From Swiss-Prot:
V region of the variable domain of immunoglobulin light chains that participates in the antigen recognition. Immunoglobulins, also known as antibodies, are membrane-bound or secreted glycoproteins produced by B lymphocytes. In the recognition phase of humoral immunity, the membrane-bound immunoglobulins serve as receptors which, upon binding of a specific antigen, trigger the clonal expansion and differentiation of B lymphocytes into immunoglobulins-secreting plasma cells. Residues 69-75 are annotated as: Complementarity-determining-2. This is Immunoglobulin kappa variable 6-21. It is found in: Secreted; Cell membrane. It comes from Homo sapiens (Human). GO terms for biological process: adaptive immune response; immune response. The gene is IGKV6-21. Residues 20-42 are annotated as: Framework-1. Residues 20-114 form the Ig-like domain. Disulfide bonds join 42-107. The keyword Secreted applies. PROSITE patterns: IG_LIKE (PS50835). PANTHER family: IMMUNOGLOBULIN LIGHT CHAIN (PTHR23267).
Length: 114
């Protein structure tokens, strides 16, 4: 059995004009095996429309954008990664997990991308 670590920050604080938006991600850790389906959720403390992005970060590497604006796959990202949701509830799904997917995954709220 080859476990994959899927770790996310539980709270991300993002300043906004209407006050701070808190993103709560779960689970904070998940051990799974290849070929499994993995679901990671992100909940915003107030509605953010579709301004939610998902990133993958591997050790000693910069974060890689996977999904932009809740459900739009970024160029070159494998089709097993998908995103959904709007308003306050969002989901990142990895279908048929591969060993190379072992990483930290996190959500980020922003109306624009860097």
């Amino acid at each position: 059995m080859l476990p994959s670590q899927l770790i996310g920050f539980l709270l991300l604080w993002v300043p906004a004009s209407r006050g701070e938006i808190v993103l709560t991600q779960s689970p904070d850790f998940q051990s799974v095996t290849p070929k499994e389906k993995v679901t990671i959720t992100c909940r915003a403390s107030q509605s953010i429309g579709s301004s939610l992005h998902w990133y993958q970060q591997k050790p000693d590497q910069s974060p890689k954008l996977l999904i932009k604006y809740a459900s739009q796959s970024f160029s070159g990202v494998p089709s097993r990664f998908s995103g959904s949701g709007s308003g306050t509830d969002f989901t990142l799904t990895i279908n048929s997990l591969e060993a190379e997917d072992a990483a930290t995954y996190y959500c980020h709220q922003s109306s624009s991308l860097p």
